[in-house]
Structure formats: C-alpha cells, structure tokens
Amino acid sequence: MGSYSDNTPAIHDLAQKMISNSMIDTSLYSKYNVKRGLRDLDGKGVLTGLTDISTIIQNKEVDGKLVPCDGELYYRGYNVNDIVGGILEDDRFGFEEVVYLLLFGEMPNVAQLKDFKDLLVKYRTLPQNFVRDVILKAPSEDMMNSIARSVLTLFCYDDNPNDTSVDNVLRQCIQLISVFPMLSVYGYHAYNHYLRDKSLYIHRAEPTMSTAEVILSLLRPDRKYTPLEAKVLDMALILHMEHGGGNNSTFTTHVVTSSGTDTYSATAAALASLKGPKHGGANVKVFYMFEDIKKHIKDWKDDEEIEDYLEKILEKQTFDRMGLIYGMGHAVYTISDPRQIILKGAVQKLAKAEGYDEDFELYERVERLAPQVIGKKRKIYKGVASNVDFYSGLLYSMLDIPCELYTPMFATARIAGWSAHRLEEIVNVGKIIRPAYMSISTMKDYTPLEKR
C-alpha cells in the first residue's frame, strides 16, 4: 500500500496529459492585451480599487512626464520615514502605535495609545488548552501552514465567527493581531520538539512587553534579549506592516472579503498567499542564497568573484537553479525601496554590535553588484534595486530567529495591514471582485462514451 504522499507513475502520466491540454500560447496574451499579473510591462499595476490605508510613490511628474524617483511609503498619509524617525527619537517601541494608526486612520494620543495597548494585552491569550490541543498535538514542518491551521481553528472558539459587522470584525482583527506572535513561536516550538527532537519550552507573554519583546521572550529559552535587539525587531515589524492594496496577500484579503466570508477564512487566505516564495517567502530565500554564496566564494571582498557567481545564479547553474537573485527588484519600486533603506541602517547598527560586520559588507557588495549583473544578463523594463527582503534575513539571523520563522515574522507584522484593508472593504460595501478571463477554447462536438 502506497504512502498518502506518493506521486505514482499513474499520477505522472495524468499530469503530463493535463499539461499538454493546458498550455496557452504566450503570444495570445499580447494579442488580447492581457495584463498578466495585473501589471503592464513597465510594472505599473492595473487599477482595481481605491484605498486610504497607505500610499506608495515610485515616480513623480517632471515637465509633464512621469519619471522614476526614490520610493516613498506613507501610512494613512504619514511618511514612514517620519514615523520611524519619531519613534527612534523617543527611544520607544512603536508597533502598537502604528497598528492603531492603520486601523483607525489617526495617530493616538498618550491616553488612547495606553488604552489600545491594554486592549492588545487583554486579547493576547489563546483559548484554554488551545496550545496543547491544536498547536502541540499536530506540529507542522511549515510554520505558515501551522499558523493558518490555528487561525482557522480559532473560528470554532468564536461565538460569532460569521458576523461581518464592523464591530465584530474589528474585535476579531485585534484579537488576531494580539495572538499572532504566540501562534508563530508556539508553532515553531512544537515543530522543534516533535519533529526535530529538541527540548520543548512554552513561555507566557508578559503583559508589560511590546510585541517585539513578546516574540523574543517567547522564542528564547532564557527569555533574555537586549534593548537594541528588541528595538530593531520592532522597526522591522513596522516596515512590514502594510504596503498598499495591490500586493498579493492584501489583494487576496480584498478579494476574499468581498465574497462576504468570515475573518478567519480571509486571514488564512492571506497567509496562504504570503507563504509563496514570490511574495513573503522571498526573505528566507535571500538568506539561503547568501549561505550558498558564502560557501562558494573564497574572497568575500573580490567583486569579480562575486559577479561571476551571481551570473551563475542567473544562468540557473547553481543555488536553487531558478535563475533569480532574491531580494533584488520590486513590482512597484524602480530606484529604491524606502523600507529597505531604513532597515539597512538598523541592520548595520546591529551587525556592528553583534560582530557581523563581514556578513554585512558581503550583503552590501552583492546589493551593489547584482543590478549590474542583472542588467547584462536580462532584458529589463525598469530599474532593479534591493527590496525590504534583502536585509531582513540577515537581521533575523542576528536575532537568532530560526529560518522557519522568517515569513511568519512578516505575517505577524502584515496582519495589521490585512485587518485594515478587510475593514475598509467591509465599510465601503464593495461588489464581489470578479475580473474577466477570456476563453480560448475550441468548440467540440460531444462524443458518446462508447465511441471515444
């Protein structure tokens, strides 16, 4: 009797049949002006909706023409550079404050922020025995699947899971934002213990801790962390919280929400999207790529040797043979990703404190050389610059966050943006999202079964 997961010869034969009858002539996309990926060749997205949650600027008008510019990102009209700068100047944690901003559209005052933090702490608890019965009893080797399963199971513990009124959805969203750190870290501990035979420890979240502190304290055996570590993680969370309505996972949130489904299902769908290596899964790909580079390059300061190896990566001769230099390029930004610029400064500071100077310098060299290599080897329609994923893997590794949690860290931040967009979709009572697909099928006469 074969395993549940076996791909048998029969399945292979059926797969080949499916492929032969499913291929579409790529020239037809141009013929019918299909916007593959809902984007033009220059990367400009097809306008499918309106949002007041965030603003992304990648070009500006000069002499009546749009020209690429350094990227800018605004949360509810506030420049992210200013938000992060203000938080750094005050030497405080800011994730919870920015969650408030994204959800409610305005900056909280001191009293409002305190009340909101208290609300997050109140909801930072899972149902009785949930960790034992749901997370520990069915560990997964993929943390994104573990989180999605936990989110869907929370539906069963909610007395009003299908109520899509604004009040109820807001309550559900705040609860999910509060428990995502625990779903992520506890899921990892279950995997680490039951599938890797490591020690198991489950810490409780302290009510006085920020979200970044909760993550580090739950993850580490001794619960210890430095203020710098927690502040840098807090910044990374802020920079990953939101990025417009058109990114794959947030657009998924809009699409699924427009059907009228519940919050848990919409969030699970967004998680499934973010898991993909072309979206949130790219950060761990960057880290693995650099681990491969370190193994194969003798002199980390030799530009020529680095260029040669990057060319091999592009030509599918090494690493994962996908032909991609991960962390380079973005669907929207052309010249620079503002999140990457902010994060890079924090990563450099942490690298110096933790003794990762040589690693950081290697990342900088690849960041400088990769656009040149891509420009020589590929036909590109817009500029190529490093994105926020480029340095995030190095950051997480310096924080001793395991690779299995890289994308869940992204999700722990982005749940705030997903929640804001879900609420925006509900408040504005939009139509169900249903774009057009053109059929290119050839009409055929039906043949009775015995005559085929």
Task: State what each model feature region is.
Residues 1-452:
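Non-transmembrane, aqueous-exposed alpha-helical and coiled segments at domain scale
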